[in-house]
Amino acid sequence: RCAVATSTSRVLTEERLRKLHLIQYFDYICCGDEVKHTKPSPDVYLNVIDTMNVCKDNALVFEDSAVGVQAAWSAGIPVVMVPDLVQATEIQQRQTVKIISSLHEGIPLLDEIQKDGMKYERCI
């Protein structure tokens, strides 16, 4: 099961996900215009965790931005960073469980995590 937690508005998020034919892969979407504070506040992540009734330790966030890493870390959710244009700083390196160079590395990472006995109920 997967969710989207974004600072982007609902209209723009759904437009982009539909255009990319990805919207059907997500069980829940929480957007920046639906929470009181956007990233780096943890509100979007806490909303997803609460709504989907998932333990933070059983969730895993994939993030491409520094503010997103900060938000997930502040929410107490393990985070994997996939740096976009800017490489991870020392702070983000400490706040993440792993840094990968591409989302293509995400599936093998999830397989490795499950093989090692860590069960993530949800990817955000």
Regions found by a protein language model. Name each.
Residues T6-T8:
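Conserved phosphate-coupling serine/threonine residues in phosphotransfer and NTP-handling enzymes
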Residues R10, E14-I124:
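Asp-based, Mg2+/Mn2+-dependent phosphohydrolase catalytic module
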